[in-house]
Amino acid sequence: MTLRFYDTASATIKDFVPVHPGEARLYYCGATVQGAPHIGHVRSALVFDVLARWLRFRGLEVTTVRNVTDIDDKILVNSRASYEQDYSGDHAREPWWALAYRFEGVFGQAYAALGIDRPTYEPRATGHVPEMHALIQELIDAGHAYPATDGSGDVYFDVRSWPRYGELTRQRVEDMQDAPDADPRGKRDPRDFALWKGRKEDEPLSASWDSPWGRGRPGWHLECSAMAGKYLGAHFDIHGGGLDLRFPHHENELAQSTAAGREFANFWLHNGLVTYEGEKMSKSIGNTVSPQDMLREARPLAVRYYLGQAHYRSVLDYRPTSLQEATAAVERVEAVLVAARAAGLGLDRDTQDVPAEFVAVMDDDLNVPRALAVLHETVRAANSALATGDHDAARPLVAAVAGMSDVLGLLQLMDLEGAGAGGAEHRALDVLVQDLLAQRAAARTARDWASADRIRDQLAAAGVVVKDGAQGSAWSVES
């Protein structure tokens, strides 16, 4: 069966034909590192992690790009807020770039804990300002962008100059809301959006760059177009992100890229949002859930299973029992592999043996719910064969379970050495250590260095060594 995906732009499921034969090039929007992640951020990253894994399984050479937006209005606002809330006098104001780097690490720790692969490239917006300047100049030269005439230093995309504007979300310009990213003064049309934002007097000098239009910083939409073009070329296969990014972010990306003469993405894939008991997650309501919250309640294996179990285009609803149910389901898969090892059946963690039905449903718009149904069906058959001692029948079934678990990113998080008390003891210890690491991460986020050091020392006294890295903290037992 041919790979097929739902393309938001055409609102149809289309056959996937790579731009470059034998390759798949994928760009998906990463974090704006203004604060700690919630489960919606992690779900999106996991969706595109599974997509990349499946494309590789199908024999394609996959290049992935997940950007980091490390300069943004909200980052500057939160940096100012962190200063205003610091009454101790012990610390100077946290610079915007330090806040961004700190939360980039928190995101990385969440990704790593859930086995989400590092992308081929993970570019920061601040490292690609020259490419953004070049794209702006192309648009000005083509008559699709203009510097504001009010002396602000802003540069805007002229939506009226591009007849295709609105094609991604199938809207007419007349029906769109005004762009919220800048004052309407200096614009030709209220819906024109900022490509470059002139520096304001109350903003740090370090948060701006010299440009032909004056000192300032790039607009959010421009950042992604410039970085996608640099790493994937003018024409690539898939652009992805959360459903909430379709408009205005992805609409504006598409417009400025195609207006500059780039074909841009063949497919636009959008994952559904996450709700809490049917309601939108909101800080004001107080119903947001963080990856750390989930990892305190369940193993990374169960959290990954939960976040990936719904179809990527569906809403994923979180309930207090969600992780308990996910734990029960995925540990049935893990248990059959542990039982197979105990019975003397070898297990290759890199096996690629999967049933034809699994391949068919994954090829059909990445239908993970149906793929999980095939997985659990195979688990039941393998358990029956093991129970009767029919190892010849069990062997291919166990290999299929391992292969499907590997493709879905579950196998790497399983404790297949745990046939007996040792594995259970390790899991129990991991729960305790992860809780302490979460407390330590919270202390570091609050810049409470004394508490963070005290937790590290407590762990060290118990023989647990903590290593901090760019992707978060890892632990091991001192030998």
Swiss-Prot record:
Annotated Gene Ontology cellular component terms: cytosol
Stored Pfam families: CysS_C, DALR_2, tRNA-synt_1e
UniProt keyword annotation of Glycoprotein present: no
Basic and acidic residues biased stretches: 182-197
Location in or out of the cell: Cytoplasm
GO molecular function, one term: cysteine-tRNA ligase activity
Binding-site list for Zn(2+): 29, 224, 249, 253
Residues involved in ATP binding: 283
Region span, Disordered: 171-197
Reaction catalyzed: tRNA(Cys) + L-cysteine + ATP = L-cysteinyl-tRNA(Cys) + AMP + diphosphate
InterPro entries to which the protein is assigned, alphabetical: Cys-tRNA-ligase, Cys-tRNA-synt_Ia_DALR, Cys-tRNA/MSH_ligase, CysS_C, Rossmann-like_a/b/a_fold, tRNA-synt_1_cat_dom, tRNAsynth_Ia_anticodon-bd
Gene Ontology BP term (one): cysteinyl-tRNA aminoacylation
Keywords attached to this entry: Aminoacyl-tRNA synthetase, ATP-binding, Cytoplasm, Ligase, Metal-binding, Nucleotide-binding, Protein biosynthesis, Zinc
Assembly behavior: Monomer.
NCBIfam families: cysS (TIGR00435)
Family matches, as PANTHER family: CYSTEINE--TRNA LIGASE, CYSTEINYL-TRNA SYNTHETASE
Protein name as catalogued: Cysteine--tRNA ligase
Native organism taxonomy: Bacteria, Bacillati, Actinomycetota, Actinomycetes, Micrococcales
Gene designation: cysS
